[in-house]
Amino acid sequence: MAVIHFNEQGFDKALANGGLMMVDFWASWCGPCKMLAPTIDQLAQQYEGKALIGKVNVDEEQALAIRYGVMSIPTVIYFKDGQEIDRKVGVMPAAAFASVLDANL
C-alpha cells in the first residue's frame, strides 16, 4: 500500500478509526525529509494491513502541525487507538521506526 497523504479531515478520520498509525510530518523544502521519504515508503509496504503509514505536509496542514507541537521536521508520530504513543525527530534507519511499530502491533 502506498503512503497516505493526509489533509486535516482525512487525518482526523483515520485517527478516529483507531488501530496503529505512523505519521511523518514533513515539508517539500526540507532536505532531511526528502532523505527519509524512501524509508517511509518502504515501511508502508512492509506494514500493509498491519499499520497505517501516512504523511502530513506541514506547510499545507499547519493546524495539524500546531495541534501536535511539531517544531522540527521530519517528525514521525505514532498513534494507537487515537492516542499518541511515541515520536521520533530526524532521519533514522528504517529499523528505528519499525521497532516502535513492532512493539505496538
Predicted regions and their residues:
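Conserved redox-active cysteine motifs that mediate thiol-disulfide chemistry
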Residues: 25-39
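Non-catalytic, surface beta->alpha helical segment in thiol-disulfide oxidoreductase systems
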Residues: 78-105
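Conserved helix-turn-beta segment immediately C-terminal to the redox Cys motif
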Residues: 18-20, 37-56
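Structural micro-motif
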Residues: 62, 68-77, 92-95
